Amino acid sequence: VIDAVAVEIDAEAVVVRAARPLVVVSSAVAGGGLGRARALVNLRVPRDVDCATVGARLAEFARRRDLPTPWVGLCTAAATERAEVVTERADDVTATAIATVGLSNPVSAGLSARAAWRPATINTLVLVDAAPAPAALVNLVATVTEAKVLALLDAGVRLPDGALPSGTSTDAIVVAATGRGPACPYGGPVTAVGWAVARAVRAAVGTGARRWLEARR
């Protein structure tokens, strides 16, 4: 997908391993925030998992699979073996989106009532072969979110009451950059890096959403 970055997908997890540390911004449950990571994990867990055990589950998985440290970890009840992987390029920038999509708890931000955490979710890992500035990394999180919402609308996802979706109640995003290649001061949707990221995310999430809906018709 991207040189010196390996992606492993199976029924247990989506794993990204990097030969050199990636610069990462994420909302991950383990290792989230802004930092560096040699591995990214999106671990499948039971739908009724006790959220207090998620950190320990991720740590046990990391040990068993011998993941390099530091690592960033997410969890999902969606089928990880059905992760959608899309790569897009713009100018000298390459972006890969890896999305797992579960839509059993869709929400409309600002309308849906507060609720307990659930692992059925949309998790989006984005790999960028470029050198975005810290502010651009944050900007890319917004770009990923915009593309995700549009993908759901395009796929025809709606809440039971007909409201438009913004995602699910527990969506998570990871944006990880190699730090090599072109410098990117901005990450909006019409920059080279933002354009590549948005197209990859929109395609990956859209395909995953349509597949989820079709399986339940």
How should these model regions be labeled?
Residues 1-217:
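Alpha/propeptide regions of enzymes that mature by internal proteolysis
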